């Protein structure tokens, strides 16, 4: 039997906590036997004293074990259970292509996703722009879809890592969100509860990233790879660029449209293609579905070329109560905005810099995201035809096409776009899409 205040005191004085002490505290968070004040105190001591790698692994596993951990053995699946997690960005629609692509190559992806947070779009919000799409199938249906289709994208239920919800809510109001051991545990507790064989982390870098500097993004990626492997799940991470909107669009319905066009081959933004492929390659190799980069890329290109990936996406949408002909007739089903009009720069020049975060916030301001949890989303609004870094813009080539609910909203968004995109006389040097791969 432990006392919460003694655990806090031990960490306050700079000592490492044992696995038993950490489990006692986390179970107390779940069972409401630990007070909010005690959670806040421990969070602050961890913020200042950090945690050793064994402590980080214990914290993550205790949070994972605070609720249901999915077990797939009874389904006798003939491939690995794999997933991807992104720290979030703008136009980051990779999940919608990656899940079907990897499933078409023999993987099983039980993807538990989130809603939009701050300036970043949420995969669930995007999928809910599809009429009827059910993000909360019951457990048996979820398992059926994974077995039959290979991929399902659903929302987090209260039974998964419940301690994290209470821990995070306290961190949010006590200035202890940006602690790497706490971020790592929060991300991984939910992902590892999926019962995965392998995981790839997409950690964003740049003006639209969750972490403010390259060094902090790198530290988070290294922490996640170390902890997840320590918890027994093969994990690699990619540091990918978020100094500009990743896709050509940003919003909800507009990104779903781009995902379908990507899968069918109608249109593939080259940067989005690079990042999606790189993440899929990691999943295939870690899941032992390919022996190396070349084999993985060949398999992935094949399922894009032969239509299998698009077919899997269509089957997932139908299985989750969306239209059965969505891939063929997406334009018929996705909501359209009242006003669609391009915004042009005031001068000619090359796009040299983009405040990606500000562009994400502009989508939120138009109604495409939530300022508070109770807000409803306008799925139709957003940006398409986004200019990329290095593009030459003038009276012919717009900065973006804005889809808005009315003229006022369009004007506000146009102002935000112009303020967020800087022009120069010369094109900037091109930046990589993937900066670094991190493995154990």
Curated annotation (Swiss-Prot):
Glycosyltransferase found in the keyword field: yes
Keyword Transferase carried by entry: yes
GO molecular function: 1,4-alpha-oligoglucan phosphorylase activity; thymidine phosphorylase activity
Recorded catalytic activity of this chain's protein: thymidine + phosphate = 2-deoxy-alpha-D-ribose 1-phosphate + thymine
Enzyme class of the recorded protein, top EC level: transferase
Function: The enzymes which catalyze the reversible phosphorolysis of pyrimidine nucleosides are involved in the degradation of these compounds and in their utilization as carbon and energy sources, or in the rescue of pyrimidine bases for nucleotide synthesis.
Protein name per Swiss-Prot or TrEMBL: Thymidine phosphorylase
Organism: Shigella flexneri
